[in-house]
């Protein structure tokens, strides 16, 4: 929970009141004359002329009314042209595996921040569906989607890949294609899902290679705008694929790998047989066995 306090003129507060009128809430504070709540951020205007913004990300709303964040020291490479790569779908039973690599330069930062691109994990799916097309249009990127059918052909015992090596292959290919398109980064960062040593081990099996060094960094999505952009575009690609598969089978396929996925998988088995899971799900997940057990 963060708090931002602004000293505002009567005119500025009047503008704030008008803008947030539809979000107004009641306040019992004797020193406050206006309060509102917008997307989880509480706003209170005091008779002293001070206005507080309190919530998980108060700076987003406060910036609309004159707040300017103190410059923070950026992570190494943040102020460089940076390729960031991330994947979505690897933890979901249903749906494909989406990997996106994006090139972000310092000139893009203001645009990205105006959209609220920080860490896509703080954005709901509705917001992601709204933002992703804007990012796809403006930010150079390469997006790959491995469908469940293709995933099941290449991932598993005795097949070309395991669940980790297939991600190495997709990240490598997305970055390779972006570099081939003319992207000239100062740094390449992947949201870490494996050690550097093992990444390089799996990389030896790939056909396409590039000389530019990569950095595997944990929680990179929250540190680098390029990785956050890739995460948002990848999430949207994954959701669109999940929608398409749901329409094809006539059942709403959930994201994730919990009990709901077991239930839907059992219904698909009952309605269409094993082939339905081969074309909509990552078959090697434990959910497949649990779905069969539900039919006994």
Curated annotation (Swiss-Prot):
Report the residue ranges that make up the RNase H type-2 domain in this protein: 80-296
Which residues are noted in the entry as a divalent metal cation-binding? Answer: 86-87, 191
Q: Which PROSITE patterns does this chain map to?
A: RNASE_H_2
Q: Quick one: signal sequence residues?
A: none
| A Pfam cross-reference name | DUF3378
Which EC number applies? 3.1.26.4
Q: Its Gene Ontology biological processes?
A: DNA replication, removal of RNA primer; mismatch repair
**UniProt keyword list:** Cytoplasm, Endonuclease, Hydrolase, Magnesium, Metal-binding, Nuclease
Where it mainly occurs, coarsely classed, is cytoplasm
The cofactor note reads: Manganese or magnesium. Binds 1 divalent metal ion per monomer in the absence of substrate. May bind a second metal ion after substrate binding.
One GO cellular component assignment for this chain's record is: ribonuclease H2 complex
EC category: hydrolase
Its cofactor is:
Mn(2+); Mg(2+)
What does this gene product do? Endonuclease that specifically degrades the RNA of RNA-DNA hybrids.
Family statement drawn from the similarity comment of this UniProt entry: Belongs to the RNase HII family. RnhC subfamily.
Q: Which HAMAP family match?
A: RNase_HIII
Protein name, UniProt field: Ribonuclease HIII
Organism from which the protein derives: Streptococcus thermophilus (strain CNRZ 1066)
């Amino acid at each position: 929970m963060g708090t931002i306090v602004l000293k505002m003129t009567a005119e500025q507060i009047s503008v704030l009141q008008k803008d947030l009128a539809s979000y107004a809430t009641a306040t019992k504070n004797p020193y406050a004359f206006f309060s509102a709540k917008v997307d989880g951020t509480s706003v209170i205007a005091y008779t002293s002329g001070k206005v507080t913004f309190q919530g998980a990300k108060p700076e987003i709303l406060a910036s609309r009314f004159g707040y300017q964040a103190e410059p923070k020291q950026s992570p190494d490479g943040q102020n460089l042209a940076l390729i960031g790569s991330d994947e979505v779908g690897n933890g979901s039973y249903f749906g494909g595996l989406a990997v996106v690599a994006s090139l972000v330069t310092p000139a893009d930062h203001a645009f990205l921040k105006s959209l609220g691109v920080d860490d896509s994990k703080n954005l709901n799916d509705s917001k992601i569906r709204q933002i992703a097309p804007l990012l796809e249009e403006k930010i150079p990127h390469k997006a790959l989607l491995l469908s469940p059918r293709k995933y099941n052909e290449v991932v598993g015992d005795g097949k070309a890949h395991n669940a980790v090596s297939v991600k190495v292959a997709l990240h490598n290919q997305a970055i390779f294609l972006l570099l081939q398109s003319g992207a000239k980064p100062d740094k390449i960062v992947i949201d870490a899902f494996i050690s550097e040593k093992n990444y390089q081990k799996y990389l030896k099996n790939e056909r396409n290679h590039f000389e530019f060094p990569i950095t595997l960094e944990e929680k990179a999505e929250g540190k680098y705008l390029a990785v956050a952009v890739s995460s948002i575009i990848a999430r949207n690609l994954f959701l669109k694929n999940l929608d398409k598969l749901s329409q094809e089978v006539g059942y709403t396929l959930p994201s994730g790998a919990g009990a709901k996925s077991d239930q839907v998988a059992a219904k698909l088995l009952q309605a269409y047989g094993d082939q339905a899971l081969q074309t909509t799900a990552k078959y090697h997940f434990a959910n497949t066995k649990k779905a069969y057990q539900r039919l006994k």
